[in-house]
Regions:
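Transmembrane helix-loop-helix hairpins at lipid-water interfaces of multipass membrane proteins
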Residues: 2, 37-107, 188, 192, ...
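An intracellular "coupling" helix at the cytosolic face of ABC transporter transmembrane type-1 domains
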Residues: 27, 31-34, 139, 158-165, ...
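C-terminal portion of ABC ATPase nucleotide-binding domains
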Residues: 3, 8-12, 243, 575-638
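Helix-loop-helix
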Residues: 66, 185-198, 280-349
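Short cytosolic helices in intracellular loops of multi-pass membrane proteins
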Residues: 121-140, 146-155, 220-262, 328-335, ...
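ABC transporter TMD-NBD coupling linker
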Residues: 327-388, 427-434, 441, 477-488, ...
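Transmembrane helices of ABC transporter permease
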Residues: 32, 39-46, 167, 171-222, ...
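ABC ATPase nucleotide-binding domain helical subdomain, centered on the C-loop/LSGGQ "ABC signature"
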Residues: 128, 357, 430-434, 442, ...
């Protein structure tokens, strides 16, 4: 889908709430870099003032030494302090010019240090703050956002801020100081010719105002399209195995081409606007310089033209010509500064749009830590849904310390959601979840998740070594503890056979390992964590029978004397659970032990019959309900 101006921006609602995001950026982060800004600003002023010294001294030398049209003087410096001979005056002029260059180099260095240091500090803080805020958002936020779009904000948009905070502010400071300094010098020498030299200023202001109003929505669209392109690229790289196995490379080529072309069009639209704007500024600035040259030159050789009065010496004329050139450069660069500002403003709005996202789970550091005494877990009339659509409703059951509770039911029954509520991936809409009598919302999120180990069906390994992945979340573990955890997870043997053993790189998301190997590393991670409560979400769903046997053996050891929740489609793996909770359409329809549920002849017995191959003995009502659930699932995926 093409991204139009103002449309399809995932953070549009937050962007509209951002009130002058650039001012907000400086209010929030500027004070922390006050020293760097002070150095940069003072150094910028002094460096630019020193840049005015050579042309001024050249004008003095021409009038006093070469044309002898006025006495040699340096403003407030007493005449008796100055050399009386032309040779001495010339030597002093050279010394002052050389000194201004040397001292100016020092201040230019300090200026660059100040702007670079402040920009790096701020962009680092912005990126980290935005990431920290994103980490604290509930899983419903990530369900609605694309990874590539979020990466674009944390990378591209923050980098755009860095360019303005460094190059943009640096150029802006030089521009402001130069325009003010040059104007003061010119008016001091000859206010009439100074007015002529400043003729381009109102024209440039008018052109710039028009440029801002035109370019702002274009940059907004461009930032949205680059986010969409990054999302497409990230999605395709993550699914490269599916693309290759489906022989859909050409199809994905076309989709990336479409997304890239949308970005190309939006970017070129902004570029074309800049292309038309910048030459106009240069032409106006050049016109101002030419006008100053013509009027001043005529004044020197033929006297004051038209309504102008007074005398203009050759030295003063040379000062005007040189300073007019210094005035022309910042005028031409003014458009570049405005361009960088507009880019940064669009990016800062997206960054603060992310920071302003609602839905962060409350995690007050002052909340007490969870105190797990035995691991008794109670679900008390729990209801939760997305967008007012209930996923689980009125769920109530209790798991005693050391028990294993299995959650079973058809696809979409709400099993995984029930366990995610325990981990506070989401917060309940109604009811309570208690661990040893403590509401999970009344304890710190850190201590809650530290007390719960999670092994899911979609095992995620980070890019790094096997050792680092086992120790993830328990970073203080030593090598001996890591090896013992791997042995308990039936992983030590295959790890030892890897090329570098525990120091073998697993590749992006663990692609160098098989599914069963990744799962056993995940189990080793849970063993090392040694949690009081364990959550197993389809931990053996995608492995072969032999691997399942090994994993199940390690899980049996891990769950011993530990409160455990397990979800499994293969009912044979959970038939020994002390408590089996059967869900359908987000509600508990029955619960009990395996034998008891089979005798009841309810949904659990029917699901067991399906896996036992007893299809012909299933009631027609069960088959009809299954068909309706499948139809709803397919409709929801469309």
């Amino acid at each position: 889908m093409a991204v139009q101006e103002g449309d399809d921006d995932p953070f549009e609602e937050q962007r509209e709430r951002v009130d002058d995001s650039m001012q907000r950026l400086f209010r929030r982060y500027g004070s922390e870099n006050a020293f760097e800004y002070a150095v940069a600003i003072v150094a910028s002023v002094l460096a630019r003032l020193l840049d005015l010294v050579p042309p001024v001294m050249l004008g003095v030398a021409i009038d006093a030494i070469f044309t002898d049209s006025r006495a040699f003087g340096l403003g407030p410096v007493p005449a008796e302090w100055l050399p009386a001979t032309q040779e001495g005056q010339f030597a002093l002029t050279v010394a002052i010019i050389a000194g201004s260059f040397a001292l100016g180099a020092v201040f230019h260095w300090l200026r660059n240090w100040g702007w670079n240091a402040s920009s790096q500090n701020i962009t680092h803080d912005v990126r980290v703050d935005a990431y920290n805020q994103m980490q604290r958002l509930g899983m419903d936020f990530f369900s609605d956002k694309q990874t590539g779009e979020l990466m674009s904000i944390l990378s591209n948009d923050v980098n755009q801020l860095e360019r303005f905070l460094n190059d943009g502010l640096n150029s802006a400071s030089r521009l402001i100081v130069m325009v003010i300094g040059v104007s003061l010098v010119l008016f001091t020498y000859n206010w009439q010719l100074a007015l002529v030299a400043l003729v381009p200023v109102p024209l440039i202001a008018l052109f710039t105002y028009g440029f801002i109003s035109i370019i702002r929505p274009k940059y907004k669209t461009m930032r949205a399209t680059v986010g969409a392109l990054n999302s497409r690229l990230e999605n395709n790289l993550g699914g490269i195995q599916v693309i290759k196995s489906s022989n859909t490379e050409r199809y994905e080529d076309d989709r990336v081409d479409d997304a890239s072309m949308e970005y190309f069009d939006a970017n070129w639209d902004a570029i074309w606007t800049r292309i038309k704007f910048f030459p106009s500024l240069q032409a106006i600035s050049g016109f101002g310089f030419a006008l100053t040259f013509v009027v001043g030159g005529y004044w020197v050789f033929a006297g004051a033209p038209g309504p102008l009065t007074g005398e203009l010496t050759l030295g003063t004329f040379v000062v005007f010509i040189q300073l007019s050139q210094q005035l022309t450069w910042p005028m031409a660069q003014f458009g570049q500064v405005i361009n960088m500002y507009q880019r940064a403003e669009a990016s800062s709005a997206r960054v603060f749009g992310l920071m302003d996202e609602h839905g962060a789970l409350a995690d007050d550091d002052e909340l007490p830590d969870l105190a797990v005494e035995g691991g008794r877990v109670e679900y008390d009339d729990v209801t939760f849904g997305y967008d007012e659509e209930p996923i689980v409703e009125g769920v109530s059951f209790t798991v005693e310390p050391g028990e294993t509770a299995a959650l079973v039911g058809p696809t979409g029954a709400g099993k995984s959601t029930v366990l995610k509520l325990l981990l506070r991936m989401y917060d309940v809409d109604e009811g309570e979840i208690r661990i040893d009598g403590q509401d999970v919302r009344d304890v710190s999120l850190r201590s809650l998740r530290q007390s719960i180990g999670y092994v899911g069906q979609d095992t995620f390994l980070f890019y790094g070594t096997v050792r680092e992945n086992i120790a993830y979340g328990t970073f203080i573990a030593d090598d001996e503890e890591i090896v013992e955890a791997a042995k308990a997870a039936e992983a030590h043997e295959f790890i030892r056979d890897l090329p570098e053993g525990y120091d073998t790189m697993v590749g992006e998301r663990g692609v160098k390992l098989s599914g069963g190997q990744r799962q056993r590393i995940s189990i080793a991670r849970a063993v090392l964590k040694d949690p009081e409560i364990l959550v197993l979400d389809e931990a053996t769903s995608d492995v072969d029978t032999e691997t399942e046997m090994l994993i199940q053996r390690s899980l049996d050891e891990l769950t011993e004397d530990r409160t455990t929740f397990a979800i499994a489609h293969r009912l044979s793996t959970i038939k020994d659970a002390e408590r089996i909770v059967v869900l359908e359409d987000g509600r508990i329809v029955e619960h009990g032990g395996h034998d008891e549920l089979l005798e009841n002849g309810g949904l659990y017995a029917h699901l067991w019959g399906v896996q036992a191959g007893e299809i012909d003995e299933l009631p027609e009502e069960f088959i009809e309900r299954a068909a309706k659930r499948q139809a709803r699932t397919e409709a929801g995926n469309d």
